[in-house]
């Protein structure tokens, strides 16, 4: 008789702790925060991926704050409006007026990569580039929050009452591009974002190999299922870390012209095929390969491609079926009935696969249709894709099962597109939040809007559900404009250009960098010195002799021509 096995108490305790943590995760997931989230994994999977040392992340507090902020805007039909911040100066100025912060991959790619090698937004920089910028800004936010607290607690109650409090801890949403590779790359990227301070992350559905800025040509989508895998990887990593990081799913399906594969049936209705039977067996890629073997390149190869595409009769399968029905030798009533039946069943909402479409077409008498989606494939093997708002909506429905916010990248500030997308998304996922890129890549003056319509654009689409809106590169453009115009004037007028354009303007508008020593925290670290040394320090940075005292004094300024009567000015203390 075999001896009975006695489970050691340590094993029982281990299992007990594991099951207790699983129960905690299940309770967490059942909260209001995750009522729309559908995970393809279990709480046991998550806990099994965790270590024994529990860690808390400051970014999680910011994520909860971001969620509250955005849900409040969604409920009120308003929007959190923000823009891409370049540096600590910008992020502290933004804190006085805006309730979220954006970190742009484009700005990082062009101004601040991990290798210091600038370039366009092709997501070819090291994958810690944007997390590093997030940390840069998040550290600055925390520092200025500490600095402000020290300053306020050095004031009397009356002084504090008169001094506006600035919430420097505004949640940061960061650009995760395409996730930077396979599943494990996305997991590690998201881990970095949580550790570095991001409250939210967006991931887009372009191919990571051919990634482009959302307003460049040549964009290649991945299959719906592949992008869902990216989003699941991100959500899983956030769950493993125990954070409520806000996940934004971006789709480039409106302007994309290519897609990596046809593996997902939800993509089928938007893939283009050749309808010219004379091209049977003459694929574009084979013709280009033949041209290259005989030494053709550049314009010659482009000519081959242009001629082939011009003769291919490219269209979607649905469009090809419609054309085939119209060519049938039937009376008009019968044609219209068949067209109506086809168009009803082939609506984009139904996501017919190509196989399902062929079966339905055959029932309607379309049995000899020539339509081939392999013939037009590119040299790289990509399929031709018909981008549209409908394609973006289909993807948005799928992504909304995992992501918290859906963002459709657009080519122009088109209110009709915004409306079509919002109504489409809400027809199946009415509670999901929407985001909109108020892109500086748009020529807003060429949009046809009046100045008043531009003023109304943000609140108008906010009422459609776009509760997070952002100008990706406003920090970059503002920086360039100020420095370019100042440098030009400074070269001509010297110090007067600085005084007129910057110093006096800082004073007029109460910009706290006027007293830049104070802004940088010299007083704050003087407090450290004095605390360490018993309340006094002969080496305090803001002690006697600091030139910043000049900004607290009265002085007489000569007239504009240097000869007239002086004007007595009292400079107010700069804001914190």
From Swiss-Prot:
Pathway recorded for this protein: Carbohydrate metabolism; glyoxylate cycle; (S)-malate from isocitrate: step 1/2
According to its UniProt entry, one GO biological process term is:
tricarboxylic acid cycle
Gene3D superfamilies (alphabetical): 1.10.10.850, Phosphoenolpyruvate-binding domains (3.20.20.60)
Active site residues according to the UniProt entry:
213
Positions with a binding annotation for Mg(2+): 175
Q: Which PROSITE patterns match?
A: ISOCITRATE_LYASE
Record-level GO cellular component terms: glyoxysome
Here the disulfide bonds are none
Cellular compartments annotated: Glyoxysome
| Highest taxon listed in the record's lineage | Eukaryota
Task: Give the catalytic activity.
Answer: D-threo-isocitrate = glyoxylate + succinate
Q: Where does substrate bind?
A: 104-106, 214-215, 250, 437-441, 472
Any stretches that span the bilayer, and where are they?
none
Q: InterPro entries in the record, alphabetically?
A: ICL/PEPM (IPR039556), Isocitrate_lyase (IPR006254), Isocitrate_lyase_ph_CS (IPR018523), Pyrv/PenolPyrv_kinase-like_dom (IPR015813), Pyrv_kinase-like_dom_sf (IPR040442)
Q: Note one Pfam family from the annotation.
A: ICL
EC numbers, comma separated: 4.1.3.1
Q: Where is this motif: Microbody targeting signal?
A: 574-576
What are the GO MF terms of this UniProt record? isocitrate lyase activity; metal ion binding
Keyword annotations for this protein, in alphabetical order, are: Glyoxylate bypass, Glyoxysome, Lyase, Magnesium, Metal-binding, Peroxisome, Tricarboxylic acid cycle
The record describes the protein's role as:
Involved in storage lipid mobilization during the growth of higher plant seedling.
Instruction: Say which family it is in.
Output: Belongs to the isocitrate lyase/PEP mutase superfamily. Isocitrate lyase family.
Summary of subunit composition and partner proteins: Homotetramer.
Which PANTHER family does the annotation name?
A: BIFUNCTIONAL GLYOXYLATE CYCLE PROTEIN, ISOCITRATE LYASE/MALATE SYNTHASE
What is this protein's name? Isocitrate lyase
What is the organism field in this record?
Arabidopsis thaliana (Mouse-ear cress)
Gene (name only) = ICL
């Amino acid at each position: 008789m075999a001896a009975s096995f006695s489970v050691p108490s340590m094993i029982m305790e281990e299992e007990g702790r594991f099951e207790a943590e699983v129960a905690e995760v299940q309770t967490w997931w059942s909260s209001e925060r995750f009522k729309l989230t559908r995970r393809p994994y279990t709480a046991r999977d998550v806990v099994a991926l965790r270590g024994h040392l529990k860690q808390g992340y400051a970014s999680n507090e910011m994520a909860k704050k971001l969620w509250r902020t955005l849900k409040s805007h969604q409920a009120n039909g308003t929007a959190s409006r923000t823009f891409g911040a370049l540096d600590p100066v910008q992020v502290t100025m933004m804190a006085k007026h805006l309730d979220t912060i954006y970190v742009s991959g484009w700005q990082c790619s062009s101004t601040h990569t991990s290798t210091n090698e600038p370039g366009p937004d092709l997501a070819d920089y090291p994958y810690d580039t944007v997390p590093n910028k997030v940390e840069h800004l998040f550290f600055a936010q925390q520092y200025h929050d500490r600095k402000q607290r020290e300053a306020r607690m050095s004031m009397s109650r009356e002084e504090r009452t008169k001094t506006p409090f600035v919430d420097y801890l505004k949640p940061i949403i960061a650009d995760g591009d395409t996730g930077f590779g396979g599943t494990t790359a996305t997991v590690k990227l998201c881990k970095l974002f949580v550790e570095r301070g991001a409250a939210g992350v967006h991931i887009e559905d372009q191919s990571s190999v051919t990634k482009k800025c959302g307003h460049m040509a040549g964009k290649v989508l991945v299959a719906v299922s592949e992008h869902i895998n990216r989003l699941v990887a991100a959500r899983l990593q956030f769950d493993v870390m125990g954070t409520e990081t806000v996940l934004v799913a971006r789709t480039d399906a409106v302007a994309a012209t290519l897609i990596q594969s046809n593996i997902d049936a939800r993509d089928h209705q938007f893939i283009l095929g050749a309808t010219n039977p004379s091209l049977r067996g003459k694929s574009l890629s084979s013709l280009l390969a033949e041209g290259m073997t005989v030494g053709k390149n550049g314009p010659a190869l482009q000519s081959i491609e242009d001629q082939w595409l011009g003769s291919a009769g490219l269209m979607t399968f649905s469009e090809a079926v419609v054309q085939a029905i119209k060519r049938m030798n039937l009376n008009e009533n019968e044609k219209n009935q068949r067209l109506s039946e086809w168009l009803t069943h082939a609506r984009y909402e139904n996501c017919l696969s190509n196989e399902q479409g062929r079966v339905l077409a055959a029932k309607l008498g379309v049995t000899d249709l020539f339509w081939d989606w392999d013939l037009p494939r590119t040299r790289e093997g990509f399929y031709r894709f018909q981008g549209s708002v409908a394609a973006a909506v289909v993807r948005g429905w799928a992504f909304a099962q995992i992501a918290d916010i859906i963002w459709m990248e657009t080519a122009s500030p088109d209110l009709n597109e915004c409306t079509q997308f919002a109504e489409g998304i809400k027809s199946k996922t009415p509670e999901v939040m929407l985001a909109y890129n108020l892109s500086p890549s748009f020529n807003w003056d060429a949009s046809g809007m009046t100045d008043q319509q531009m003023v109304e654009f943000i609140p108008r689409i906010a009422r459609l559900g776009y509760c997070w809106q952002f100008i990706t590169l406003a920090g970059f453009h503002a920086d360039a404009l100020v420095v370019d115009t100042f440098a030009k004037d400074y070269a001509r007028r010297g110090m007067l250009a600085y005084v007129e354009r910057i110093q006096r303007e800082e004073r007029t508008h109460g910009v706290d960098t006027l007293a830049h020593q104070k802004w940088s925290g010299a007083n704050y670290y003087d407090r450290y010195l004095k605390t360490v040394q018993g309340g006094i320090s002969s080496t305090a940075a803001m002690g006697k002799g600091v030139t910043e005292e000049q900004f607290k004094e009265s002085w007489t300024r000569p007239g504009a021509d240097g000869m007239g009567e002086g004007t007595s000015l009292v400079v107010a203390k700069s804001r914190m």
